[in-house]
Amino acid sequence: MDQKLLTDFRSELLDSRFGAKAISTIAESKRFPLHEMRDDVAFQIINDELYLDGNARQNLATFCQTWDDENVHKLMDLSINKNWIDKEEYPQSAAIDLRCVNMVADLWHAPAPKNGQAVGTNTIGSSEACMLGGMAMKWRWRKRMEAAGKPTDKPNLVCGPVQICWHKFARYWDVELREIPMRPGQLFMDPKRMIEACDENTIGVVPTFGVTYTGNYEFPQPLHDALDKFQADTGIDIDMHIDAASGGFLAPFVAPDIVWDFRLPRVKSISASGHKFGLAPLGCGWVIWRDEEALPQELVFNVDYLGGQIGTFAINFSRPAGQVIAQYYEFLRLGREGYTKVQNASYQVAAYLADEIAKLGPYEFICTGRPDEGIPAVCFKLKDGEDPGYTLYDLSERLRLRGWQVPAFTLGGEATDIVVMRIMCRRGFEMDFAELLLEDYKASLKYLSDHPKLQGIAQQNSFKHT
């Protein structure tokens, strides 16, 4: 055998991964690689790069779950090669999907379905769910306008400070977005300003049940009642879609007396993230319609399933079934009792943080993490006229040096001069972990007090997560 080939073969067989030739070069990033390498070497390169990511458990900006038990990992692994869209090939996964739809519909007080199956679908997240809910709103509105012989070329959607997905929906589906702007003292959509924005071209009103900027609920019932009066005065009937990305899996367990869901007759659809407070792994969302009449059949495609056909309505197509199966595991594992305990624990942490942080500076709280107020988030600003010697951007930057990702950012609309800090409390961020955050918070305040010349340098480098 050629000596070079023998040497190469011996190296490939015996070299440790850190002695391998492939790891002594910079990983390809611009061109498709020419040559193969050992699997352990490729894994090591990627694994080492991922150490540069932030620690997900210390990410207090995200609404998404960052902790999953070992059974979720096992189920995800079992389902990695099952295509969610292939109902005929994977009938049991499809059956589990339908069970979840029924469970979520029951949680949100949807009317009992005529055929025993609730109307809804799993999505890749709440953004896709919002898109689907918005499409159905536009189609229903267009039908009504056509039946009345009126033009359908100027649809609009009325909402408060919404997540970016609604801006995408408006642009992609050619709908005017009438977003009620945040302003000092009026950070959320109120009935008066909502009604002023509505007309016969309004396809629907979208309250956000858990506003991303602050964590507060935009309560649907007062808006719903105002729309009732608007219809009585004008004859214009306007539907509601509830964007419950976070609140949809919180209020049913910890604040069941809040009337926000299908108990309100105008609510035709609700969307939520399974991978936020639904406790599923990333890549899971849900949208549920009130009944079959609320989902225009032109939007539904039929696919083969158990010798018959089943309707499907989605923007995405091929994707693994693992997220749905993991969501079903959480539903079975926890039930109403378990979800109530898990979510209450997050609220207790939020309340503790709000109480302790209030002692540390001149802060005005927008959200204190109470179940009757919003999601388990703590959001605050510096009191007007107060100068503690640092900005919230400075504080965010100092906390980041200890691994904590706590965003400081300006509000939107007409409130862009208001800088807030927001802390999300989720499963896995337990009381002991919160105490460690407080210790680093206090240490950061001391550092900023001892180094006043460094104030303000972090402003351009801070980040937001809304």
Curated annotation (Swiss-Prot):
It is an enzyme of class 4 (lyase). GO terms for biological process: glutamate catabolic process; intracellular pH elevation. Induction: By acidic conditions. Expression is regulated by a complex system involving RpoS, cAMP, CRP, EvgAS, H-NS, GadE, GadW and GadX. The level of involvement for each regulator varies depending upon the growth phase and the medium. It catalyses: L-glutamate + H(+) = 4-aminobutanoate + CO2. Converts glutamate to gamma-aminobutyrate (GABA), consuming one intracellular proton in the reaction. The gad system helps to maintain a near-neutral intracellular pH when cells are exposed to extremely acidic conditions. The ability to survive transit through the acidic conditions of the stomach is essential for successful colonization of the mammalian host by commensal and pathogenic bacteria. Homohexamer. Belongs to the group II decarboxylase family. This is Glutamate decarboxylase alpha. It comes from Escherichia coli (strain K12).
